[in-house]
Amino acid sequence: MMNGNGCGEAVTSSLTWSVGLLNGAHKYLTAETFGFKVNANGAALKKKQLWSLEPCVDAGEEAVRLRSHLGRYLAVDQFGNVTCDAEEHGPGAIFQITVSADAKGQWALRNTNRGYFLGASSDQLVCVAKAPGPSELWTVHLAARPQVTIRSIGRRRYAHLSATGDEIQVDAATPWGEDTLFTLEFRDGRYALHTANDRYLCPDGKLIENCAPECLFSLEFHSGYLALRDINLRYLSPIGSKAVMRTRSNSVTRDELFSLEDSVPQAAFVGFNGKYVSVKQGVDVTANQDEVSDHETFQLEWDKDTGRWFVRTMQDKYWTLESSSGIQANADKGSANCLFELNWQPDGSVTLVASNGKLVGAKKSGHLFANSEPGDPAAKFHFALVNRPVLVLRCDQGFVGRKGPSSPRLECNRASYEVVHVERADRGVCHLKGNNGKYWGIAEDGSVSVDSDDSCGFYVELREPSRLCLKTADGSYLNADKNGAFKAGAADPSQATLWEY
């Protein structure tokens, strides 16, 4: 029943996954916060159900350690007892992954020290089975943000939607724009690959509108990297001169391995003249374009020490403050002159503060200079998060999603996410739409429902690399309230909920 696939060449990696492990009774492996107790009775993937999957390359390319949210290692002692109280990993903390040979692709975890498989008896963990049965099979639930970029280990290139929008190609040197963003949808224990144009990947490389059973792939772990296997037990890889993503081989080599990387925010800015900021005409940063292309798309890279941002161009150069106070895109990363502070304004606009303390403003020619004072209309820009055509929102309580299949009201404590479609409008406004084709609307009590035929305007305010605020057109922030309530509340930005996206 079991099939262990090995790579042709071992891959050394320091990559660590954050996962949940779901047993046959649909319960999660759980590390309790008291007494370092461990069981299998978690109903949803929350903090206590998170495990860091650490590769152990020296013990084999499918060997891992499991570290709890408390920083303790899951281990099996000489008597077969399962523990999770050691801060340092010993020989009993290594497990070898084998993958079931059926389409489900579930994992069995064999303790290398004992030689037995980890299983669940009722809600208790045991390690006594010489061969894996139903109680020893685990479904892997990735706990990372579901929206990612995908990098091929063999090709050393990123996946992107083709120009015709009908296939995925793996030949991008850098992940630039919305076409390199993919959503991994967890469905029935497996994963579907959802593209930015709202299509699903089939094993033959075609993209279709609905998620058919053949669009589901099981997930495998190989030395910190990912492999995706279809229902016919063949693996996704880039094929041919166009590097089209499809399945072909029934074994794993470097060609079948991928890494999942967080998608860094990429934005466009519109000046007071209604033109997009661009580097199309050279190193001068100028607000003079009518449409968004790669030249008008800028990657925002967070500097944690200062709370400011580096602004990167498609040419791998950075905005910098010149001695003339002009802004040019000709610098390498690292200089303090390349850092800009984003300040969000009550009217939905944003100002950029340069290293000289002045606001960046656009001249009549469109050229950007950092010599403006607060209140100058030329220093206000409208912001668009261009590489997020869809959003998945999460807070400490859970994901944002509908209360139930028959209820349009949104809550923020859901165990699974719902994709939010983003429609960009003028002056930084965006409209948010659900999978039911209805728009988000705000009721008199501030609650949010997906039931409106008319679009309601929202502003996106980027606060951190993976966190944002959502503000209504009248200035109210969408906040997580107690008991999972999702409401438009106070206008004070310091009280606004930071949504992981």
Predicted feature locations:
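Lectin-like carbohydrate-binding module/patch detector with strong preference for beta-trefoil
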Residues: M2-Y501
